Amino acid sequence: ADRGLSGSFNANVLKEAQNEIDTFGKENIDLFCIGKKTRDYFTRRDYNIIESHLEFWNDLDFQHAIKIGENIINHFISKNVDEIHVCYNEFVNVATQTIQSERLLPLEYKQDDNPSNADRLYEPSKEKLTKSLIPRHLNVQMWKYLLESYASEQAARMVAMENATDNAEDMIKNLTLEFNKARQASITKEMLEIVGGAEALK
């Protein structure tokens, strides 16, 4: 995220990213940072940041996902890294966002993805299909990550603001009660002083 006021939204995903990084070792990591908070966090810790993408959330569209996705794919194809992992906030509902860490590249295939050994005919060729479909798939995945994160951020901010409002209302009630007690005590004291003065004059 670029802004605060969203509770533990940023802290949670940064913690997960840090845990993920620790398993590989700082010296083996290249980072693509999305959002100011992420960039600032890893800049302060002197990580190798390849790219930072900032201040596009108000104009979020699929082109941003394509741009980020293409750069990440090129970094992988150039054999600068062996794997690409993504840490993001998954939107479940307004009250719940979960931290996810997924391996984006290389693609993972489940055993049951190929249930039979039957020959298949690919038109165009398998290689052409792969070259065409994989970038599209990765761009859609990147778009999904951005949308999930954006929805999670707005939900976290809404919950944080609602909690802040509730806390402020509770504080107002408590302060009003304290004020009324102090006011009543002051009035009682003044009345006692008046009565005491009147008794002294008798």
Question: Could you tell me what each predicted segment is?
Answer:
Residues 1-202:
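C-terminal beta-strand-loop-alpha-helix "lid" module of Rossmann-like NAD(P)-dependent dehydrogenases
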